[in-house]
Amino acid sequence: MMKIIAFVGMPASGKSEASRIAAEMGIPVIIMGDVIRKEVLKRGLEPNDSNTGMVATDLRKHEGMGAVARRCISQIRETGSELVVVDGVRGIAEVECFRKEFGKGFILISIYAPIEVRFSRVQKRGRSDDMNSIEGLRHRDERELSWGMGEAIDASNVEIENNFTLETFRKDVRDVLSNYLEADLEK
């Protein structure tokens, strides 16, 4: 059975770092935000927070709340891997879409970090679609919560707290992923 491990969490909680760790472990990673960023560029828009949010909302409005997840399923299958990590679930409809497609093989891991910690990270990472104030981060949190992010977080199988050092977080993520990787290898 194919196993999908998806990360869910508020912006800058550590999903991308967790995905980097998975990639270092040799696990293929599908980044849901890349679907949105690709669509932003396809529409000829500048890749900033406003346009990214507008396109994400538009896709969900016209294709349903599971639109981004549905666009990722073929990419997941194309990896040919029995274990794939998905970075960036944004709502309960996406969780339901993945659970319908992969059944018990879908595992959801939520990553938690307080807003002050997340904003500090946003300031350091310098992505073009990032927000430049804590109010901007709160606005993005509200937008993502409107997509069912809170329900998705509540539906997670495992929670990893990312409120400590990077080394602690990396160890926690490796431990959780190793458990699933070992279970996969034992089959």
From Swiss-Prot:
The keyword Ligase does not apply. The keyword Nucleotide-binding applies. It comes from Methanosarcina mazei (strain ATCC BAA-159 / DSM 3647 / Goe1 / Go1 / JCM 11833 / OCM 88) (Methanosarcina frisia). ATP binds at G9, M10, P11, A12, S13, G14, K15, S16. SUPFAM superfamilies: P-loop containing nucleoside triphosphate hydrolases (SSF52540). GO terms for molecular function: ATP binding. It comes from the Archaea. Signal peptide: none annotated. Belongs to the UPF0200 family. Keywords: ATP-binding, Nucleotide-binding. This is UPF0200 protein MM_1313.
